[in-house]
Amino acid sequence: MTRIQEYKKNNYLISTNKGKLDLFTIHRFLTNSYWSKGITIDKVKNSISNSLCFGVYDGKKQIGFARVVTDFTLFGYIADVFIVEEYRGKGLSKWLMDSILEYPGIKEMRAVLLATKDAHGLYARFGFKPLEEPQRYMIRRNQHFLSLGSK
């Protein structure tokens, strides 16, 4: 059910067309982020190919990204959300989240999950809140990534 969607605002574009994505821009940001520090370009490429991706562009220049891991019916996990630093403060992350949550299939899901260390205020505006019963959730972490400092 991956239908290409595009949203335009002024000179900015959000697109789910993977053909527009700039893999090197995405990798450069993610490999320096707290959540994917040191990730290889092959892992980024593989994660993109197995996700619904949203690229944010100023003209043809990619300035943001997010991806959703989903079954397009019941559950989605939003990951790797970013706007490059020089474009922050323009409302682009809010527009990106609006676009994700309005995407056909995601809009009707039972649950959409994400993890953040520092953007709780942004996500709360979209109805995200801490897990009500965290004791019901479990996670299995790969020891290799823990040794690299990734969480």
Per-region residue spans from a language model:
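A conserved beta-strand-loop-helix scaffold within acyl/acetyltransferase catalytic domains
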Residues: D42-F82
